[in-house]
């Protein structure tokens, strides 16, 4: 299932970009969805705050079709006002106890494809962060990347370190400015004796900033922050109880609580702080459990929009915030979908306003 990585793949990075392939918007749409025209792509208004922040959007490299072109998505991300982009690279292992982690032959991009998209994003004027995440192909009950417990920890860290080295090489040769050394690995974050050589190896390969992304419910105890340059949090905070209304006042109160908690934790800390993921599915109830990736639910494009608007109202003027990455641009928009992407939905307007206000 996993693709071997090595010098042969690295040689592909220097190759000239392939000619453009068909736009992703020409691919078949999921059944039962409604096409919405993309919202106007005129340049976003200039930022109103003088703070030099990462105005970012995450782009999942999730296409299974090898002919898929990310170029049109990059153009949309620039048009919505992003100055930074996180290229999300899914890595796979069998379950939480395995150490067979690697790039999936069908569900992960090749290193050459990652390099091509990173170069294209840089040509479009964006700063690039390479952002690996771990997914489980056959998870047991309750398992996800936050509960990893490999039977052979040494083998897992060796393999993961090899992968980060390969991704760091791509990031270096393409001029990326940031590399995430991990995301939401809550059960492994305290193992600094194994993390330290991994991070040191990556630093020898990649000259840019290293980031770690902690889960929204685990950031206070993340010892791994001590080894990196920027502290990230995936911003899936519950903004309300399931029985509470999803109105502006309730959502703003939820974000104010989260902001107070984060700012109390940040007191005395010196590393830059960013939201590495800020995303909401377009379905009813999303603001009560933004982290819930489960399929199904009732589409609700307005609750998604209100969630982004609430974040803008509460956080856009926060002096201690160094950046935000919207999760996630990949995917089709439309009235019949419940996905995270804001493309072609009312949330796209709010994302434009949010990035412009940072």
Regions found by a protein language model. Give the residues of each.
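Boundary/entry segment of secreted carbohydrate-active catalytic domains
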Residues: 32-77
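Aromatic- and glycine-enriched glycan-recognition loops and surfaces
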Residues: 63-79, 102-123
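The substrate-binding groove and active-site-proximal loops of carbohydrate-active enzymes
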Residues: 58-64, 98-111, 149-159, 182-189, ...
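Short, acidic/polar
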Residues: 64-78, 157-170, 215-224, 305-314
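Substrate-binding cleft and catalytic face of glycoside hydrolase catalytic domains
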Residues: 80-99, 112-188, 283-286, 327-332
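Aromatic-rich peripheral "rim/lid" segments of glycoside hydrolase catalytic domains that contact
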Residues: 36-51, 290-296, 303-308, 314, ...
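Active-site neighborhood of glycoside hydrolase catalytic domains
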Residues: 163, 188-212
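Glycoside hydrolase catalytic-domain groove-lining segments
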Residues: 110-111, 116, 123-124, 131, ...
